[in-house]
Amino acid sequence: APVEFERADAVVEPFAEPVMCPQPQSQASGQNEGKDDYLGSEDCLYLDIYAPGGQKESERWPVMVWVHGGSNLTGHKGTYDFARLAARQQVVVVVINYRLGPLGWFSHPALNGPQLDAPALANFGTLDIIEALRWTQRNITGFGGDADNVTLFGESAGGRNVFSLLASPM
């Protein structure tokens, strides 16, 4: 299960290339060479924040959190450039990665641990999305966002993941 990022005072330098969670090569990953190779890294649970400039001290912008699609097997937060959306609509846009495929939705009794409430909990991808939302709630004001005005949206499997959170007790 994801753990809270504790280094609130640390500056995390942005990556030049988007980090993808492990996935097969595909059109969604932007890497389709007809190979059976996997791309990405398990060190992939990052988010990007796009904020418009020119904010007044007391002003807070609405926040949009985007969940990428890709059948929960492929895709990543770097699929689209949300800088224009943030600037034109005066919103803060948060884009997230979450674990995919068997790393995101694999169930096995050996996965049980003292921190898990349910036996063989398998929805690690969903838990990654929930933790990203929790992080956003705790930290978005530092980027000019309004923590009381957050909209979660997604495309394809990302939209289905958003919908699944409506049924989640978390």
Question: What is each PLM-predicted segment?
Answer:
Residues 1-126, 147:
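Non-catalytic accessory segments of hydrolases
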Residues 130-133, 163-164:
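Short, hydrophobic alpha-helix immediately C-terminal to the catalytic nucleophile
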Residues 152-155:
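Short beta-strand immediately N-terminal to the catalytic nucleophile in serine-hydrolase-like folds
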